[in-house]
Amino acid sequence: MSESDIYWTFVTASKYAGSFYQAMGNAGLAADPNNKRRILAAFPEMVATYGAASRLHQTMRAGVAA
């Protein structure tokens, strides 16, 4: 994942996820690069649901309201 993909994964989770993944998205946005990758490695379902391949991620990145 590129740094941009990682950023948008956390932004997408912080907006569209349930409360736990919203908190993880916010934590990821505040984290340093090493801890961002640790969060994503610990929660692969977060990447699957809100990562670059997801429609939500692509919508957020395109700036289209979902």
What are these regions (language model features)?
Residues 1-26:
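N-terminal acidic leader/helix
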Residues 22-56:
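Short, charge-rich amphipathic interface segments used for partner binding and complex assembly
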Residues 1-4, 58-66:
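Short intrinsically disordered terminal tails
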